[in-house]
């Protein structure tokens, strides 16, 4: 199976200089897979670096539209059966690719995620491993497995982390890729995995493939922490409104949101979660359209999706 390795970047010249040698070498060792840098409107000399230092890497320069839409354009432009999406702050192991592609050979598999390690090579604070979700005070929260004994074998997971994921292009295109509802960033990969499960496909975790990820380093360089947290909270709400088709689960979520909105009114000054709610409400019509599409196309219930990937309903 041939795969296009796509590195998405935005003003990440220094990160590209660190990550691309490993990506190019991994692609070569796995049999010669194409490598593409999909650029989200950088103006820091990234193009000059890639063209001068990595002549075999294709440069795909795009207008600044955010991570999700840049990834979508790059996947659409690829011509291989599979694709591998990588953040520029990810360092891949030399042999990371074959184990991912091996699991993709099954026709019902949409995506496969590797084992994520921190920059020091340990599991401490590493996110993206054997993902699932849990309910906390009525709200859906993403869970990342951290116990080594539960990260030894391939298994199902809720979604493949967008920082490093392999997938079948045809299924990606059927799903429509990352939904721009979640602009500018965060939760688009959760949404994609949930929708794939809803179509009857699988998302798997493959610990035999390893990458090191400096979680959030790109965001720290380009965005304020308060803004990142606001967008993450907003998109968590939009995910629930769009994807939870089970009436009881949606009622549970809406009731929890109403409770903390009322608490915030009593406090008097809008805390981040109230600002997130107001921001999400501005996108409610867009989320409703996505929900209508899901109602037409889904073949698994919410409970079946959550059970299949080991999540708690």
What residue spans do the PLM features occupy?
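A short, conserved alpha-helix in the catalytic core of glycosyltransferases
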Residues: 158-176, 181-210
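Conserved donor NDP-sugar-binding/catalytic core segment of glycosyltransferases
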Residues: 91-131
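Glycine-rich, basic loop-to-helix element that forms the pyrophosphate-binding segment
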Residues: 61-78, 88
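A conserved acidic beta->alpha catalytic loop
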Residues: 22, 39-48
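Non-catalytic, C-terminal membrane-associated alpha-helical segments of glycosyltransferases
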Residues: 247-313
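Short aromatic/hydrophobic "clamp" motif used to bind/position activated sugar donors
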Residues: 83
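Short, flexible, basic/aromatic active-site loop/helix in glycosyltransferases
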Residues: 133-157
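Short, acidic, metal-binding catalytic loop of nucleotide-sugar glycosyltransferases
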Residues: 22-32
């Amino acid at each position: 199976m041939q795969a296009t390795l796509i590195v998405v970047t935005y003003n990440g010249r220094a990160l590209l200089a660190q990550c691309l040698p490993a990506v190019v070498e991994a692609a070569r060792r796995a049999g010669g897979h194409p490598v593409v840098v999909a650029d989200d409107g950088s103006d820091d000399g990234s193009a000059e670096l890639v063209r001068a230092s990595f002549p075999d890497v294709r440069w795909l320069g795009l207008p600044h539209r955010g991570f999700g839409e840049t990834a979508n354009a790059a996947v659409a432009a690829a011509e291989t059966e599979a694709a591998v999406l990588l953040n520029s702050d990810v360092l891949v192991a030399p042999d990371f690719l074959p184990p991912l592609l091996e699991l993709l050979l099954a026709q019902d598999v949409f995506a496969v995620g590797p084992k994520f390690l921190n920059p020091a090579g340990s599991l401490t604070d590493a996110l993206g491993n054997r993902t699932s979700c849990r309910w906390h005070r009525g709200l859906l929260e993403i869970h990342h497995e951290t116990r080594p004994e539960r990260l030894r074998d391939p298994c199902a997971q809720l979604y493949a982390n967008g920082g490093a994921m392999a997938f079948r292009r045809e299924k990606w295109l059927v799903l429509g890729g990352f939904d721009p509802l979640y602009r500018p960033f965060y939760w688009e990969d959760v949404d994609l995995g949930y929708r794939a499960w809803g179509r009857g496909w699988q998302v798997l975790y493959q610990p035999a493939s390893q990458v090191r990820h400096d979680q959030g380093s790109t965001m720290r360089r380009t965005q304020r922490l308060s803004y990142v947290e606001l967008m993450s909270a907003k998109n968590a709400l939009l995910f629930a409104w769009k994807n939870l088709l089970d009436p009881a689960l949606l009622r549970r979520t809406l009731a929890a949101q109403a409770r903390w909105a009322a608490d915030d009114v009593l406090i008097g000054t809008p805390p981040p979660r109230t600002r997130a709610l107001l921001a999400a409400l501005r996108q409610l019509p867009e989320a409703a359209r996505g929900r209508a599409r899901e109602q037409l196309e889904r073949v698994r219930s919410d409970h079946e999706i959550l059970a299949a990937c080991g999540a708690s309903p």
